Amino acid sequence: MDATLAFPLLVGLIAVALFFDFLNGLHDAANSIATIVSTRVLRPQYAVFWAAFFNFIAFLFFGLHVAETLGTGIIDPGIVTPQVIFAALMGAITWNIVTWVFGIPSSSSHALIGGLVGAGLAKTGFSSIVWQGLLKTAGAIVMSPGIGFVLALLLVLIVSWLFVRQTPFAVDSTFRVLQFVSASLYSLGHGGNDAQKTMGIIAVLLFSQGYLGSEFYVPFWVVITCQAAIALGTLFGGWRIVHTMGSKITKLNPMQGFCAETGGAITLFAATWLGIPVSTTHTITGAIIGVGAARRVSAVRWGLAGNIVVAWVITMPAAALISALCYFAADLVA
């Protein structure tokens, strides 16, 4: 392919992608620290530094399978143009900002995938969609909250049985320490899965402009800059969403926080190794609901959980609609 986009414009579009990655950290990093903050194991200002560090080093632990899926497995890379990438990013960024302002824990992953699909449909219609990859991703998006729910619920039941003879103080003290481990694992999972989505976007843009040759791959500088952007976003993560995730859905103690984070982390690790982009937001939401339901069903604020599900359902079509409109606008200007 010929490199048809002026270099300054290419740099500008990459900057937009990195801004999305920063917003992803800002918006979704709350998921990494919500439970450890709500259980008062760490203060918010210390928790964000903790999460940012593990978000940044996540590339050391995972392959780049999620980036490859985003780059080649959602829409046909052959139809990708700068307008498609711009529209996809603007759809995702716009929706992320709207939900962040209102403190709604919607998914940056859903928004980006919806943005890609909307831009692809606007350009060439249904032929632009890689249906096998999209359906696999959509299936994982639907299943991941349920998997997080089940794993966290099982962990609570197992841990409660193992520590049944311990005093509440001893259990609390033990899991205050163990929550550092579980929060670290969840932050690794978040950085490993979410940063790779932006890597895939930047890499397919470079590929479409001929900068990668005939083979799609993710350059190392893209890996580092994306991990840095999501880590910086984590440092500025929003307390609005931390409060919703960590205390409004259900009250948590350190043992429950450990189980929620561990259940969510296992889900994210498996998805990342399989190359499936999933929602870190809804994975931890499912896990938090699971630990609340293990205590008693009424411990979960089901009304708020229902609002989160509504946001989960409308995110992809909303981002797709915004991105399609942005594509048509960008195409007119071009």
Curated annotation (Swiss-Prot):
InterPro entries: Phos_transporter
The UniProt record lists the keyword RNA-binding: no
Membrane topology: Multi-pass membrane protein
Parts of the chain that traverse the membrane: 3-23, 47-67, 84-104, 111-131, 139-159, 216-236, 258-278, 308-328
Catalytic activity: phosphate(in) + H(+)(in) = phosphate(out) + H(+)(out)
GO biological process, one term: phosphate ion transmembrane transport
Keywords tagged on the record: Cell membrane, Membrane, Phosphate transport, Symport, Transmembrane, Transmembrane helix, Transport
An example molecular function term from Gene Ontology annotations: phosphate transmembrane transporter activity
Compartments where found: Cell membrane
Source taxon at top rank: Bacteria
UniProt-listed Pfam families: PHO4
GO cellular component, one term: plasma membrane
Family: Belongs to the inorganic phosphate transporter (PiT) (TC 2.A.20) family. Pit subfamily.
Functional note: Low-affinity inorganic phosphate transporter.
Protein name: Probable low-affinity inorganic phosphate transporter
Name of the gene: pit
